[in-house]
Amino acid sequence: MRILFVTWAWPSHLYAMVPVAWACRAAGHDVLVASQPELTGTILGTGLPAAPVGGDVDAAAVFREIALPPPATERRPAPGGPRVLGLLTTLAEAMTDDLVELGRNWRADLIVFEPTAFAGPLAAAALGVPAVRHLYGTDLLSAAGRFLPDALGPLCEKLGIAAVDPFGAATLDPCPPGLQVPVGSRRLPVRYVPYNGPGLLPAPPPATPPGRPLVCVTWGTTLSRLDPGLFLAGQAARAIGGLDVDVLLAVTPAQRGLLGPLPAGTRVAESAPLHLLAPGCDLVVAHGGAGTLLTALAHGLPQVLVPRLPDHVRHSARLGEAGAGVVLPAEEAAPEAIRDAVAGVLASPGHRDAAERLRREMHGQPAPAGVVPELELIAAGGTPS
């Protein structure tokens, strides 16, 4: 079987699909990952073969407009949701023609796409092959389903297809049920296996007094890419430096210079995937990105989240509703608020209990290898169980 995985050029959306892609490869199937040229090097870094399609689009510019308040002299732009949907249709338009040609020439049997890569189901419909959606977090687009036919209508017309199901024949869902919202198509649960990119195992930490909590602070990669002022990892570390905790900062080399002065004893881990750092931690302070959130939950860690982008806000809200942490709106995340939230979560066993409950749910879902037979069934024209 030939399985074509599709994402637009955003690394975290790719990373969510890597474990299932490798499970398919290990089962003997041919796997290819298609995305815009900008992501080619990142795909190759996963060990999977890449196929560039379409042209690059400056998605960061749209997210930057959403995340940063407009100058007082400018009119406030449209809400973030419509602008994001407009961006996603632009990305689909940039990729779809090349993706259809690639799928035809490569003779794809199945397309697996991340939920915001509409080029995936569009190409599948044009090629007459099934498509399966692969979530990277909570199902953010299920609530937007009624808007998608109109948004994708012009692309369907261009491809000569009557309509497209943007949710696919089924949805691979790595979220534990206690975190997820209702899914827009048949749900195929799959265990979340953290893949946070390649990296080095950090040196063992120095010995600390028994019972002293270790707090990991990370701000992902998106916000520093949009604007250095949105990267709050250094501020968060300084905010909690006065507590009786050890602080571990997880950053990229490019982010190291954005941290500023740090409290004495703060450890900084560069280029270390979060899943290698999480096992020794007691709490994660972060920005609310899905990859960070799910990786922390995979280790049963409660979280303090300061989300800013719309998807981060919605992922974080679900974590807060599940009781596995505290969410601080970005505009209210003063240093003392972060410090108090961290102290409160560490002192409350209820947050850790909720995180542990979600961890058990997550580990109770089938491993990536366990969903490969379902994908084989869908590719053969069957209905998943």
At which residue positions do the language-model features occur?
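Conserved nucleotide-sugar phosphate-binding/catalytic loop shared by glycosyltransferases and other
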Residues: 32-80
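A short, active-site helix/loop in glycosyltransferases that binds the activated sugar's phosphate group
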Residues: 157-189
